[in-house]
Structure formats: structure tokens, C-alpha cells
């Protein structure tokens, strides 16, 4: 459907209209604001189920809804494996984990995340996601993982996202994904985020296109965006192929 020019035009018009109404702020996951479109939440769920990662790395924490979503999916993987193998397990203990990075984890958000039932699967790291010291902490926290999935959703300028891709994409395992959110900024009208430094020509999509041109280990999987139609991550589903 994503190849249909008429549907594509309608989709861009709709996304532009609802973006002005802060559509992504209307949803929660297990009680925490997730700040994602429902279609992208479904896509994230599908990827986690398909890939079955040991570790999910996320840049950008905000209220923690995305961390909680990833952690809950990892919990469901544990439950599914226990059922298949006929084993019992402690649901509060898991080898799977979510690593969240944010330059400023607000105390009330940290407290809410730490009180959440999914907290045992989450580790939060405060610092710039592109600071070498922060990147080193993430690498150490992910050490030993065989299957890694990455979600990039923090600062949306070209330079920042490019640095994130250079830092975190190499951690992605073959067959898994680095998903870059808010590439849709390039497709929205100029000035759609007039209170932010990103805009057309300076955003995650421009960073993706610049980065992937030099990284043949990854390819853009457009089948996902063509299926979703409504997504904030067009050209942002990057699959590691070698």
C-alpha cells in the first residue's frame, strides 16, 4: 500500500495535521506515556517478537513508556519460552534487559519507572547518548548479549543522529535492527517544529541517508513502512544484513 501515490499523499497530509495536535502524546503503555504512534508501537512489538533480543538499547527515555513497552515484550518472551520448555521461572529475574539512555532523566520519571513492575528488566544511564563515556557504559551494560536491537529516539538533529548511528549501530546483531525514529520530520512542512533545532534538511532521515550510504552492513527495510503507512520512521527501519 505504501507504493500507492494517492494513499501516500493522504497519509502525509494526515500525519502533518495530527502532528500539530501532538498526536503521539495521547498514548500510554502499561500506565506510562509512550510518545509514539500506535502503528509504530505495533511495529516495535513485531520486531521484538521476530528478533527475540537479549538486549534492547534505547536512546531517549522521557516518561519511560517505550522502556516499559520493550521490557514487557521481553517479559512475554520469557513467558513464551517457559511455556514451550515446560519450565517455571521467577518473572522478576531475567537475562534479558532494556538499556535506556537520556541526557536528563527527570527524577519523577526515574521514580515512576523504578516503581513499575517491569523495572527489574530496565537499566537507565544518564548522559549524552553520543558522549564516549556514555557509549562505553552502554557497551558494558550490553556485554555478553548475543542478539541486540536498537531504538534511536533522542535529539533529532542530523549531526546528533549521525553520531548515534556511528556509536550504536555496530552493536546491532546480524538480522536485527537499528530503528531511527522521527525521520518523518523530513516529510513534514518546513517549520513544523518551530521550537526545535531540527527541520527539513536537518533531521534523522538526512542522517540515515548519509550514514547508510557508507555502511553496506545495513539496508533500509521499506516493507515495514509500506505496511504501516502511518509511521514516524519512514526509511528508519535499518536491518543489519551482514
Describe each region flagged by the PLM.
Residues 1-42:
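Mobile, glycine- and charge-enriched loop segments
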Residues 30-32, 41-242:
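S-adenosylmethionine/decaboxylated-SAM
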Amino acid at each position: 500500500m505504501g507504493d500507492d501515490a494517492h494513499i501516500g499523499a493522504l497519509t502525509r497530509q494526515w500525519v502533518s495535521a495530527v502532528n500539530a495536535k501532538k498526536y503521539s502524546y495521547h498514548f500510554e503503555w502499561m500506565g506510562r506515556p509512550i510518545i509514539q504512534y500506535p502503528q509504530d508501537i505495533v511495529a516495535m512489538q513485531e520486531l521484538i517478537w521476530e528478533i527475540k533480543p537479549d538486549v534492547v538499547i534505547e536512546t531517549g527515555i522521557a516518561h519511560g513508556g517505550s522502556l516499559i513497552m520493550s521490557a514487557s515484550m521481553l517479559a512475554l518472551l520469557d513467558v513464551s519460552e517457559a511455556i514451550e520448555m515446560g519450565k517455571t521461572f521467577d518473572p522478576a529475574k531475567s537475562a534479558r534487559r532494556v538499556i535506556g539512555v537520556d541526557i536528563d532523566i527527570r527524577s519523577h520519571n526515574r521514580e515512576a519507572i523504578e516503581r513499575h513492575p517491569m523495572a527489574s528488566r530496565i537499566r537507565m544511564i544518564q548522559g549524552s547518548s553520543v558522549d564516549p563515556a556514555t557509549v562505553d557504559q552502554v557497551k558494558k551494560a550490553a556485554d555478553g548479549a548475543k542478539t541486540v536491537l536498537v531504538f534511536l529516539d533522542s535529539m533529532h538533529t542530523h549531526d546528533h543522529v549521525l553520531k548515534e548511528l556511528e556509536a550504536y549501530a555496530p552493536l546491532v546483531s546480524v538480522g536485527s535492527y537499528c530503528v531511527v525514529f522521527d525521520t518523518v520530520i523530513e516529510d513534514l512542512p518546513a517549520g513544523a517544529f518551530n521550537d526545535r533545532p531540527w527541520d527539513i534538511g536537518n533531521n534523522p532521515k538526512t542522517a540515515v541517508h548519509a550514514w547508510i550510504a557508507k555502511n553496506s552492513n545495513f539496508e533500509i527495510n521499506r516493507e515495514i513502512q509500506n505496511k504501516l503507512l502511518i509511521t514516524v520512521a519512514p526509511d528508519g527501519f535499518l536491518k543489519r544484513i551482514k
